[in-house]
Structures are given as C-alpha cells and as structure tokens.
C-alpha cells in the first residue's frame, strides 16, 4: 500500500527495508512540541489571509491542541509507517477533525516545516544551555571567592611553573565559559529567522504572510531566500561548533579533576556523590563523573564532524541526507547539558586540600621567576641577565636537593654577589601570589574582586 500522504504517484508501498531506513520517527518525535507550535502559527496565518475558512482553522487548532495533550500524557502512538513527526501529527489530526486536517499543509512542505522545527528546537536548547553555563560560572565564582587565597601550583607543560591561587584557576574557566555563552548567543541570533512558507524550495503561489508566521513563533524575521531556507543547516553546525568548544573547556577541567583527585596528586577531594567504586579493588574511589564528561566531549565533537561531512557534498536544495542532522544534534546538545550539570555538581562538591596544594606550589622551584624579578627591581639587572643568574641559582639548589628558600645567602652570593637577605621575602609562595597585582593576575585581592564582580554580573539562580 502506498503512503496516503504522498503516495498518489505510486502504485505500491515501499519495501520493508526502505520503510526502516526512511523512517525518522524514532528520533524526530522529540520535535513534536515544535512541530505543533509551527502548525498552529501556520494555520492561524492561513486563516487571517483568507486562505482557509474560519471553521477549518478552529477545528485544526483544537485538533492540534488535542494531539499535543495526548503526547504530553504519553498516550500518542508513534508509528514507523508514518515516517516522521510531521506525518504522525497530521495523521492523528485527521482522525480527530476529519478532512479539514488535509488543509493544514496548504502553502507548506515538509522541507520548510522540518527546518522550522529544528530551528525552534535548537533555539530552545541553546537558551537552556546558556542558563546551565551561567550556573556553572556561578559555582566556579563562588568557589573562587572562598579560595581566593588558597595557594596552588600553576603549571605549564604539566610542570610546576609559578604559584597561583585555586580561586584564580577557577576564574580561568569562568572566562572560557563566558566566551562559550557568547558563541551560543551568536548562534541563536543567526538562527532566529523563520523558514516556514519557503515551501519545498521555490516559495508558494498562495498569498501567505511569512512575517506574521515568523513573529508568531518568536523569530526576528522570515528567511530571505526560499532555496537557502530549506537547504541550510548552518544553524545546527554553528550550534554544534559552539557546543564542541564548550565541551573542550569542560573536558580540560574534567581532566584536571581526574589528575587532582589521584593519590599521586591529592589536590582535591570529591564526595561519594561524584565517585564510584571498583568491583574488585575495595579501596578505589574513581572520578567517573569527570571521566564521562571528558569522554562525552569526543562524542559532541564527533556530531559536529559528522554533520559537516553530511552537508559538504549536497546540491541545493533539500536532500534526504539532511535527515541525518537530527540524531547527532539532539545527542550532542543533550550530552552537553548533562556534562554541564555534572560539572556544576562537582564544582560545588569538591574540597581543595589546602596543605597539599601549598606544598606542591613551592615545589619545582616555582618562585624562580620571583627571584629573577627581584634581581631586576633591586639590582637594576636586565631581565635576560637576571634569567641567567636565576638559572644558576636554581642549579645550585638542585645540586643540593633543596628548595630556593632553603639555599643559603652565601651560596646565592657565590652566583651573584649583589644578592642580599632581602631576597628571601619573595621566595615564599604566599608572597609570590600576593605580588601578582597586575590586572588579571593571581593576587588574592584581585581574585576576590573579580569573583565577586562575576557573581554580581551573573545574578542569583533563576527559579
């Protein structure tokens, strides 16, 4: 039996495997709310333009709301033979209101319909993700205030570099997440044009009002070119790109948590709520939540790469290949949502081990730059010369197996006679971080001020 929605040209129905590969209802059912919103806006416009009689408009509107209620109650039956969410909704609408339902698709194609549905879904999801990113920023800023003066090692090449504070480290991620929110907002602004009314690809001969439909759905304007309207998936690609960059940021922090919670580092503790045990090793507390965030970043990046590859060879306008935009986009953006929730939970849960952090901050001659800066300030030494002198002092300490602050003044003066005992004041890690008062530096007062500024900017949690 041919499909009654489009089967007039066909004498028989599709092969079973054709039906299976063609159907998208298994995943695009999550567009049900957006599909019904689009149909309600479309039928209202058809009525206001005099294209449909008022009684048909009223019947269709009531029927669509009934379908929406059935879906919300879990009573709606999604059937594979109906292919997709558009035909599933229309089929049930026909059962409810009769032949009038067939008028709903006037001046519309599934091509512009699905493009509209996807834009609505991505827009809704970007708004939700933005709120989640803000919540993670808030958690990080709160931690930064609390630990503005908690000294820890700063790393380059995963080698001790210079002391920083735990709060300063948290604020680095607040800044990254701020850029992520900017990218989400940019993507949202560009996607906020309405394809509905572009029809299959060429527009329609009916006197529709696309501006009214766009306004009813909260879009800024209708899309300007009917071919581009149905051929475009830039909005999904751009959103996946922004999601991928955000996921990379989360993955970097997750990697640090995995390392920091290890017995070899012991920088932070996570509670039982964010760790799991081993089936054979009773002592284990594994940071599985952080590891899964790290893994899901790859999954999100994979969705972006996959859709880029799908789109790269498609001629205008619509091809069935574009049905493959949905699963990856749905999965990636929902995976990011899960990662954001997990990271916010871990940030609020984690407990820095201050003594371990402080001890590690002083290892690896991390205050060597402070010594070089002291030589520049106090002895008026060119920095390149100070760098060389400091390197020789570090070598002397390393040969003795001691820290810089443990090296005797006599040993330092053997390298540079002008060094005085005043140098020891800059070799402690607290003094080191306190001295970094330049804008954006790790001085505790800077960190506290910036963290409080972020909390003010972010505002309270929205209920």
Curated annotation (Swiss-Prot):
Its main subcellular localisation, reduced to a broad class, is cytoplasm
Chain ranges passing through the membrane: none
Cystines in this chain: none
Quote the pathway field: Amino-acid biosynthesis; L-arginine biosynthesis; L-arginine from L-ornithine and carbamoyl phosphate: step 3/3
Q: Which residues does UniProt assign to the signal peptide?
A: none
SUPFAM superfamilies documented for this protein? L-aspartase-like
Per the UniProt entry, the Enzyme Commission number(s) are: 4.3.2.1
**Reactions performed catalytically:** 2-(N(omega)-L-arginino)succinate = fumarate + L-arginine
Q: State the CDD domains in the record.
A: Argininosuccinate_lyase (cd01359)
Q: Keyword set for this entry?
A: Amino-acid biosynthesis, Arginine biosynthesis, Cytoplasm, Lyase
What this protein is called in its record is Argininosuccinate lyase
